[in-house]
């Protein structure tokens, strides 16, 4: 492709609203442009990268036995109401009405549509297992779109769905697609980890996320320093044991703590360690209000609270709800005096506290010498806190460290969550009606492009891995007015294309500095500069990833490039 014919508008300055490297560079290099908050156009070079990621995805999905189809982006509300997610999915689901007031959603995901499709067509175990996938635009009404393609309102996604007669069949396909995902991200050149995850609004049980390691990732990965254990911090269980002190219990005492609300403030004011404080929080679990207790130096994990109750929605109670329930402000909450009709659950660590501290449910006061079970009752002790760095790894090997990650893929064992809700059944080999067993497998295709850009860049621009680069080689005649340079550039361009390489020829009448700056921004793997030594049959070859350059004779160029790109 000749650069003079390409729409690739570059920017010299960093856009003010672009917070992270991938967002900045994809805009500056002219790979995309923003249309509205969280909505982007892919320009020609960006689209080439997107298509290469799609191709890798398709190859690995088909190798794993999946078959491609295409479902509608616009989905009838009735299907979502049938599954129960019309009400539980939340405000991220983009909803609309047609001229006849019939409700629809723009697809955030396609479980309902695929289940409806398959239940009408697959009636016997003889047609199972079946794995279908699509690459389709998805829509989510993000409250705060940010980070470019990493959190948008419109994005490209590969979503696959498998249907089975037995759990063993689901396990087999799940493992196969887990490996396919590992192959996809490895072929894209990414440094990633597969981690144990929460299924969230998707439902189901076993699930893994594929996380690209990056400091700008919005997720925290908890991993062992000596084993291959890795989990999203939301899902990492705490296996610590807590020893209760043999300190004698003291008499409960209420003390004034004016203007002291946060644990750090209260512990400093009372000269008591944070681990002897009891942090009390009120959560709304579906429609039920529950008091949750953790140690003062720990944080409540709301996903674990959700899993205790098998709830659809868990959120912090509002200040108004707390005041109505316990007649105090949030900073003075405590378990003492909470009436028996309000359930209290606590993290295991709370049970070991002796002569601790808690809010007194009265503004400006706390209790000291608080002892669980003597001073208040807990209905259940369980694991409710986030794991911390330095905790024992849940697999018993090593200790936990943290890393940040960008989620690019997610695989779920949905089980019968959707098939039972939507009456999607088949006849088994005994002629009995059974619900279809399902799996679900998603990849953020456009997000993967951003993740690659986030991992592969330097101070000068993008540094694309060979497998996804828009072109393999960038040929730059420095001076287009020079017949020797122009003709040699054209000859190299044509010969490399004949060898099967994708080549970009900078045939613009621009200054050398402009050409080199754009070349660094684009980040193609190999740059061939045709300069003053063209008359001698010599060019300069530069490897973008390493910065290494060498003068090469034109007759040796193809072999030299082949060794770089092998």
From Swiss-Prot:
SUPFAM superfamilies: Class II aaRS ABD-related (SSF52954), Class II aaRS and biotin synthetases (SSF55681), YbaK/ProRS associated domain (SSF55826). GO terms for molecular function: aminoacyl-tRNA deacylase activity; ATP binding; catalytic activity, acting on a protein; proline-tRNA ligase activity; transferase activity. GO terms for cellular component: cytosol. Its EC number is 6.1.1.15. The keyword Nucleotide-binding applies. GO terms for biological process: prolyl-tRNA aminoacylation. PROSITE patterns: AA_TRNA_LIGASE_II. It holds the Pfam family HGTP_anticodon. It catalyses: tRNA(Pro) + L-proline + ATP = L-prolyl-tRNA(Pro) + AMP + diphosphate. Catalyzes the attachment of proline to tRNA(Pro) in a two-step reaction: proline is first activated by ATP to form Pro-AMP and then transferred to the acceptor end of tRNA(Pro). As ProRS can inadvertently accommodate and process non-cognate amino acids such as alanine and cysteine, to avoid such errors it has two additional distinct editing activities against alanine. One activity is designated as 'pretransfer' editing and involves the tRNA(Pro)-independent hydrolysis of activated Ala-AMP. Homodimer. Belongs to the class-II aminoacyl-tRNA synthetase family. ProS type 1 subfamily. This is Proline--tRNA ligase.
